[in-house]
């Protein structure tokens, strides 16, 4: 009869530690791009809606990821991935392959 392989790899970081580290990184990035009162209001909304639960942690992670992605995409001046309607980087209409 077949047996499951033994756990031979390095110990994986528990999900909750990973989620809290990710949340801290997202918060640090968000305060560089959004007003603190907005972020405080978002935190209050999440706390009032979900309380102090893992569902709340995952909700705020998802919202911060979406906010930051959208912010970068529509043209954060600190980002290189924004949409630029003026076609920055082109000279005289020529494009390089």
UniProtKB/Swiss-Prot annotation:
Any one biological process term the GO annotation gives: viral penetration into host nucleus
Post-translational modification Phosphoserine, affected residues: 79, 95, 97
PTM text: Phosphorylated on several residues by host. These phosphorylations regulate VPR activity for the nuclear import of the HIV-1 pre-integration complex.
A single GO cellular-component term on record: host extracellular space
The keyword Ion transport is annotated on this UniProt entry: yes
HAMAP family: HIV_VPR (MF_04080)
Name by which UniProt lists this protein: Protein Vpr
Species for this entry: Human immunodeficiency virus type 1 group O (isolate ANT70)
Organism classification: Viruses, Riboviria, Pararnavirae, Artverviricota, Revtraviricetes
Protein's gene: vpr
